[in-house]
Amino acid sequence: MAPSQLPPIFNPTPQDIEMLLAAQCHLGSKNLQVHMEPYLWKTRPDGVNVINVGKTWEKILLAARIIAAIDNPADICVISARPYGQRAVLKFASHTGATAIAGRFTPGNFTNYITRSFKEPRLIVVTDPRTDAQAIKEASYVNIPVIALCDTDSPTDFVDVAIPTNNKGRHAIGLIWWLLAREVLRLRGTLANREVDWDVVVDLYFYRDPEAEENKEVAEEKVASAEDVGAGAIESGFAAESWDAQGAAAPAAFAAAGATSWEADGGDWAASSAPAPGGENWAEAQPAEGAKW
């Protein structure tokens, strides 16, 4: 990390640097755009360009000072066509009062006043200059300043302030938007001082897959708790109640079925055990004529 040119009050804390590294904000792509070269720290042997997180922090503070200088927060438009940044811009807008455009950017939002979604912002902040190219192009037509989260391969045409960071990972995007919102609130005075931690956790800015969350809820509903089936069932895989019910019902059913069959067949047994009438002996009986063994 290069020496900072900021006043000591604006220096990042060790926790801020650890969060930037943990979210992999410093890992760029293998391609390098010429205008992003000043923000490069080094290139790894595998070809991945590593971004200087000190420059990232300085640009976050610069962008926060620009945003805080605008009187009406609604005049700031935060945009993300990339899915990983849509939740982040919505949370940023709710915490700072900005206007969010999450998803597809309708062409003509800034230039065609006939459209219902026409806007005249004083500043726009985009997640990726490549996916949000339409918004940047229209902003250049009407002289709107642009702040963008730029990777090492991002185009910087018509971008006024580039925040060098990894803009492809969901954790990196969410963390940058969270840090930007926190610094804006500190400059506005919403947060008392820099020693006070923000009570909003960074996890709220991370992208979440709706299908994965729905499948997780369904799986949790199917799994029975220990209170429902008993602690022994969790270990053995069988509920004790089912064993007890089967053990109590089986002897009774067997006894009832056996008693009825024996009583019904009792008469037949007595008849078959009686001696044959006439004292006949099967050994004395003569075989019929024509019978052959």
Curated annotation (Swiss-Prot):
So which domain of life are we looking at?
Eukaryota
Region spans: Disordered: 265-293
Q: Which residues cross the membrane?
A: none
Q: Does the keyword Magnesium apply?
A: no
Question: Which keywords does this Swiss-Prot/TrEMBL entry list?
Answer: Cytoplasm, Ribonucleoprotein, Ribosomal protein
A Gene Ontology biological process annotation? ribosomal small subunit assembly
GO cellular component, alphabetical, reads: cytosolic small ribosomal subunit
Compartments it resides in? Cytoplasm
GO molecular-function terms, A-Z: structural constituent of ribosome
Report the InterPro entries cross-referenced here. Ribosomal_uS2 (IPR001865), Ribosomal_uS2_C (IPR032281), Ribosomal_uS2_CS (IPR018130), Ribosomal_uS2_euk (IPR027498), Ribosomal_uS2_euk/arc (IPR005707), Ribosomal_uS2_flav_dom_sf (IPR023591)
Name the PROSITE patterns on file: RIBOSOMAL_S2_2
Record-stated family: Belongs to the universal ribosomal protein uS2 family.
| HAMAP family, A to Z | Ribosomal_S2_euk (MF_03015)
Record note on quaternary structure: Component of the small ribosomal subunit. Mature ribosomes consist of a small (40S) and a large (60S) subunit. The 40S subunit contains about 33 different proteins and 1 molecule of RNA (18S). The 60S subunit contains about 49 different proteins and 3 molecules of RNA (25S, 5.8S and 5S). Interacts with rps21.
Q: What does this protein do?
A: Required for the assembly and/or stability of the 40S ribosomal subunit. Required for the processing of the 20S rRNA-precursor to mature 18S rRNA in a late step of the maturation of 40S ribosomal subunits.
Q: What protein is this chain from? A: Small ribosomal subunit protein uS2
